[in-house]
Amino acid sequence: MTKFIAAAVQMDSQDDKMANLAAAEGYIREAAARGARLVVLPESMNYIGRDMAQEAEAIPGGPTFQRLSGLARELDLWLEAGSIYESNQEDPARPFNTTFLIRPDG
């Protein structure tokens, strides 16, 4: 029987997106070092704060997707991004709460 290791990350995201992404990267790298083939991040993993609409980003293409996609490719693992605020072109004041799954090829 083939062994499959999945990791669930719990983290305390705040209103500093870059700090949250750096923390998430550390947890992802730790999980990969322990043999995880799937890493699942929590809801609102990259930002929790008042400026949700301002911090919303395009998927794919935004900084969170780009960083996580690169990590999935580098570490050869599946990465479920919990959720992030995605830009809503029809109503920019109301971003979507979106999750996405990244394959090992990024």
Predicted regions located by residue number:
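A generic structural signal for ordered alpha-helices
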Residues: T2, V9, N46-R50
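Active-site-proximal beta-strand elements of phosphoester/diester hydrolases
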Residues: K3-D15, V40, T98
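Cys-nucleophile CN-hydrolase/nitrilase-fold catalytic domain and related Cys-dependent amidase chemistry
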Residues: K17, G26-P104
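PLP-dependent aminotransferase-class I/II
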Residues: A23
